[in-house]
Structures are given as C-alpha cells and as structure tokens.
C-alpha cells in the first residue's frame, strides 16, 4: 500500500520539468500547509525530475518565502548537475501562482565506505503495549495522522528545557521513506515552546534535511515507531533554531534535520 502521504505527494508532469497538484488541508499546519509536507511534495517533484530510483536523496534544503495555501501547487524543477556518484536538482515552488519557496536537493548512490558512528541513540523506554498516546493541544491537523509518546519533556508550555522528544507512530502514513522523513522531522511540538510560557507561533524560514540511512527499511514498518530528539540552542533576534535527530527503534540514525523559524509577536 502506498500510504496516505505518498498519495498526497503525487504530481502531474506538465512537461519541461514542471509538476503540479491540487493540495487540500489534510496536511495542514498553522494557517497554511504543514512545512514538512511541502518539503515532501517538493522532494517528490525533484525525485521525479531526476528519474532514477537508484539515485536516493542525501540532502535537501528548502527556504520558505511565503505561506503555502491549499489549492494549486507548482514545482518548476531543474536538474543542475549529473555525475557518476552525485546529482543535484533545484525547484522553484509556487502556491496559488506566487513564488513561495526554493528547494535544492543532492542525490547519490549509497556507499558503505570509511564508516563510523559517534552519536549514540537516546536510551529511552520503548512504547508500552498498553500505553496511550499523548494528544497535543496545538490543533494542527497533521498531528491527527500520528500517535506521539513523549519521553524527553512534555507537551506543556513553559518551565522546561529546550530539549524534547519521544516516539512517533504513524497511523496511515505509509512506509517511513524519504518522503515521510521531512514530515516526521517537522512534526513534534518545537523545543522552544517548552521554554516559552506564552504562545508565540514560530514558522519555518528554512529546513535542511540529511538522510542518514537507506529507506524504507524492513525494521521500520509503516506502523512502527521512530524516535525524534529535538534541541534548540536559542531564540535570538526574533528567530529560533532547532536540530532534530530521527532514530529507528533498533538504534540506527535515520535522518537529521535543522531549521530556523521566524517567531511571531502576539
């Protein structure tokens, strides 16, 4: 089964590297399409533009210039470079006819060469067989497609550390693949919200995602849990950063993400 996310990342090829779809509010965030979902749709377009399944995405950067609304989505892609081991694709992303984002992705053939791992997975308890998920209070529709189990910090505002995380279990997402990773990386309530006692919406300025494992994996089934670990260095000058590590239940690093958010004053 392709899963709901892959269905909602499907695009129509209009020719000359142009891909389009009509987006609804299934993957909705704070008054606009969820940033991780937009990144997934952009990656879907760039992957199709490259046209070779052996060339897996290794890194993707996206800058958000204005909100992405439901309705017409358009990606104008360009294969910037093709090589023996690396390929680069860019995309100009439009929402309702306006330029709303820019994306650049690097693709490469997975090679096991000179490997080592120095980052250790979080030593947190797995999801219990009868454990109930914790529902967030943000009212973000995208959260309805996941069950979340906090392990580091809580979903409460104020009084906490800028380090949060826990298990994420998709309900109807489909396989945890390269399209799912940007959504999962952007899913958890931001670590900064744990520090702020008063609500201050923070929206994505840019997101960079590094894919650190071949995907999908047999040990990460569609309904299986992955662990997200989020840290924020600081909220400074009206912008707040966030680093995210995504781990499999077996302790393998699946992806890393970093983003900067614009903090709105209320």
Tell me what each language-model feature is.
Residues 1-266:
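Terminal targeting signals and extreme-terminal segments of soluble enzymes
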């Amino acid at each position: 089964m392709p899963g709901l996310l892959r269905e909602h990342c499907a695009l129509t090829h209009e020719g000359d590297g142009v891909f389009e779809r009509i987006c609804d509010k299934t993957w909705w965030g704070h008054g606009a399409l969820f940033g991780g979902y937009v990144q997934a749709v952009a990656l879907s377009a760039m992957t199709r533009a490259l046209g070779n399944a052996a060339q897996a995405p290794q890194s993707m950067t996206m800058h958000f210039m204005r909100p992405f609304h439901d309705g017409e989505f358009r990606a104008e892609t360009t294969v910037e470079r093709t090589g023996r081991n690396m390929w680069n694709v860019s995309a100009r992303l439009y929402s309702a006819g306006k330029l709303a984002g820019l994306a650049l992705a690097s693709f490469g053939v997975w090679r096991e060469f000179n490997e080592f791992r120095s980052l250790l997975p979080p030593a947190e308890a797995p999801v219990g067989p009868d454990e109930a998920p914790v529902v967030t209070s943000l009212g973000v529709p995208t959260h309805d497609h996941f069950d979340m189990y906090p392990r580091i910090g809580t979903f409460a505002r104020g009084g906490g550390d800028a380090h949060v995380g826990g298990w994420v279990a998709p309900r109807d997402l489909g396989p945890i693949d390269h399209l799912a990773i940007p959504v999962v990386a952007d899913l958890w309530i931001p670590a900064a919200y744990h520090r702020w006692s008063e609500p201050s919406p923070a929206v994505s300025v840019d997101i960079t995602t590094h894919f650190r494992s071949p995907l999908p994996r047999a040990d990460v089934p569609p309904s299986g849990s992955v662990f997200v670990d989020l840290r924020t260095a600081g909220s400074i000058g009206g912008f707040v950063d966030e680093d995210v590590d995504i781990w499999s239940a077996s302790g393998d690093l699946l992806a890393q993400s970093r983003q900067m958010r614009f903090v709105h004053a209320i």
